[in-house]
Amino acid sequence: MRAQPEYANALFVFNDNEEQFVAFERGQPEGVSPGGGNAGVRPWRGENPPRSAGIPTGRRGRGYASLDAKVTEVLGRAFAEIQALVDSGRYDTMVFSRDSRLEALGASIFAPDPLIRQLVYRALVRVKPGHPSPWSDSTPGGTGVTHP
């Protein structure tokens, strides 16, 4: 897909685990090591310019069970990174996994709570250049996205 001309300027957003997301933030090599499923594109985040960005969907081998303060904060950092990449002007599209049954982020390895998947998906489709990150803790439930 990456080699196809229509994806030459695409940012690939993959489902990350929190541990490797944090490792990337700290500049550790495991932050760019390939993973399973759509995290196979994780190494692309180490390129210049980055071709991928991660959205944490779980930790310690399990999907996030609830949208607690820690999960909200980690997702906020991920969305800030994605927003900064989109604002760079290098990308004309984002590619990410979608579960059309739920209108939610697709997931296969981790099984995060469906509400989290829906909120992440809704925030991803709202990422636009020059706009504030769509994920914030300024609204009820800790997200800038309306709850279903």
Where are the model-predicted features located?
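Macrodomain-like recognition of ADP-ribose-binding/processing modules
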Residues: 1-148
